[in-house]
Amino acid sequence: MILDLSDGTVLHELWTVQRLAYAVEAELIGFDGIPPLHESLDELRACDETFLGLYDEEGLAGAVSYRLDGSTVDICRLVVHPRAHRRGIASKLLDALPDGPQVVSTGTRNEPALALYRKRGFVETGTREVGPGVSLTDLAKQ
């Protein structure tokens, strides 16, 4: 379902899940400077991404955001609440994205994310350093 970030409750749920999810990634990659980890509610509300969310009995379990670049789906964020890990939430969210080629970037040391994308047919297209000792891996799927 599309998340309406003009709804304060939805916005706060997303912000909370995002902070929890990126805290896990920060620990995995040894870098706490991930921009969404430090994003304010106002910054999140103002971003130009479309968000899809998946709820379970406890609330928002995960979300994915994207931008369309022509026919290419640029995946901006994929976050899963730590309580919902290993339940297929990320795969369900990726399944809900629009059809077309997809691109995504993730921390090079985030092995769980890389494994998920590889399993779903993404191939690595490059790596770039974004800070001292911190790199992102770019992936694409046709």
For each predicted feature, which ranges?
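Conserved catalytic-core motifs of GNAT/GCN5-like acyltransferases
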Residues: V103-S105, V123-D138
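A short beta-loop-alpha structural element at the N-terminal edge
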Residues: M1-T16
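Conserved GNAT-fold acetyl-CoA-binding loop/helix
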Residues: T16-C47
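A short, internal acetyl-CoA/4′-phosphopantetheine-binding micro-motif in the GNAT/acyltransferase core
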Residues: C76-R86, T106-T108
